[in-house]
């Protein structure tokens, strides 16, 4: 069992030793249960110590793991009767965005999210989770449909950013993102956004204008990657770890700053260790969030959403607030 992340090495070493002792016990008549129990207790304490003191760069690495749960993974556990819709009715379909109608605890909802692959083959199909304009237009089509039929909208955010290629620019990437921001601000139904992995720049924000913004504990949300910030600030992308420390891109930091509304805890070691349990954590907060938003009428939902984003960018100077409008 190889450690994929540097800070996981002590955990992996102990897990490997426990596995070896268990195998030895099976292959021999020796009783090592006491030693195994002692090591398992030590492992639990070590995991608590490591995962409760993760640095921002550690969380960035967890958010990028190939086997981290995706939008479709969570749809499988959180929703029933999911029916995926395809195409933007203008150009084509984009596999980097998935969306459709489903039932959440019996209630009709619209679910939309970025979708990346878990291996090279799937990533090529999903364009590594980086949407083209048609992906964002598909998302907007589904949002307008939800608005028409009074269905709450749940958006899962997990992208490095919108695809920056020539073809995407020619088909109006910036316009597609801007149109989503504009239209989402005026939706008359509850909109809940959840960052489940990387939330990169405008590509993330195009699904991120909601009444509530939630983040998984080891996800990130930023205007640029740590590598990109390091390249701009210090002309050296290898200083990404330093950039991550100062950018305030993790859920704990963003919750403290008031950018997000709640942080969803992750299973020990990260969401990829137990998708079903992680979906349960999301379900608990999502259910309560929707319950509170469903008490608001259309005018109140729009007003609350407007005030939420208007408040971002205000700073206190000598007890006076200066708004960045």
Curated annotation (Swiss-Prot):
It catalyses: N(6)-carboxybiotinyl-L-lysyl-[protein] + acetyl-CoA = N(6)-biotinyl-L-lysyl-[protein] + malonyl-CoA. InterPro entries: Acetyl_CoA_COase_a_su, ClpP/crotonase-like_dom_sf, COA_CT_C. GO terms for molecular function: acetyl-CoA carboxylase activity; ATP binding; carboxyl- or carbamoyltransferase activity. Its EC number is 2.1.3.15. The keyword Protein biosynthesis does not apply. One of its GO terms (cellular component) is acetyl-CoA carboxylase complex. Keywords: ATP-binding, Cytoplasm, Fatty acid biosynthesis, Fatty acid metabolism, Lipid biosynthesis, Lipid metabolism, Nucleotide-binding, Transferase. It is an enzyme of class 2 (transferase). The keyword ATP-binding applies. Its main location: cytoplasm. Pathway: Lipid metabolism; malonyl-CoA biosynthesis; malonyl-CoA from acetyl-CoA: step 1/1. Component of the acetyl coenzyme A carboxylase (ACC) complex. First, biotin carboxylase catalyzes the carboxylation of biotin on its carrier protein (BCCP) and then the CO(2) group is transferred by the carboxyltransferase to acetyl-CoA to form malonyl-CoA. Acetyl-CoA carboxylase is a heterohexamer composed of biotin carboxyl carrier protein (AccB), biotin carboxylase (AccC) and two subunits each of ACCase subunit alpha (AccA) and ACCase subunit beta (AccD). Belongs to the AccA family. This is Acetyl-coenzyme A carboxylase carboxyl transferase subunit alpha.
């Amino acid at each position: 069992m190889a450690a994929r992340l540097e800070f996981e090495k002590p955990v992996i070493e102990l897990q490997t030793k426990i596995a070896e002792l268990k195998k030895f016990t099976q292959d021999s008549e020796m009783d090592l249960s006491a030693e195994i129990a002692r090591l398992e207790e030590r492992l639990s304490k070590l995991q608590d110590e490591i995962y409760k003191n993760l640095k921002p760069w550690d969380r960035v690495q967890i958010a990028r793991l190939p086997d981290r749960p995706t939008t479709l993974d969570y749809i499988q556990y959180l929703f029933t009767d999911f029916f995926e819709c395809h195409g933007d009715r203008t150009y084509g379909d984009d596999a980097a965005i998935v969306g459709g109608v489903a039932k959440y605890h019996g209630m009709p909802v619209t679910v939309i999210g970025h979708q990346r692959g878990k291996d090279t083959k799937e990533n090529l199909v999903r364009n590594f989770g980086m949407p083209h304009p048609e992906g964002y237009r598909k998302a907007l089509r589904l949002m307008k449909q939800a608005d028409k039929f009074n269905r709450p909208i749940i958006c899962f955010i997990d992208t490095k950013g919108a695809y920056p290629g020539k073809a995407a620019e020619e088909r109006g990437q910036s316009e597609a993102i801007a149109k989503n921001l504009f239209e989402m601000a005026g939706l008359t139904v509850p909109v809940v956004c959840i960052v489940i992995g990387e939330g990169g720049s405008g590509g993330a924000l195009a699904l991120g204008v909601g009444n509530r913004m939630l983040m998984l504990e080891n996800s990130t949300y930023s205007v640029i990657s740590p590598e990109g910030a390091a390249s701009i600030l210090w002309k050296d992308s290898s200083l990404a770890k330093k950039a991550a420390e100062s950018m305030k891109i993790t859920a704990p930091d963003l919750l403290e700053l008031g950018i997000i509304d709640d942080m969803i805890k992750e299973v020990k070691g990260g969401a990829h260790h137990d998708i079903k349990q992680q979906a349960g954590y999301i379900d608990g907060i999502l259910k309560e969030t929707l319950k509170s938003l469903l008490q608001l009428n259309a005018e109140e939902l729009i007003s609350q959403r407007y005030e939420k984003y208007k408040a971002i960018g205000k700073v206190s100077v000598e007890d006076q607030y200066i708004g960045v409008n």
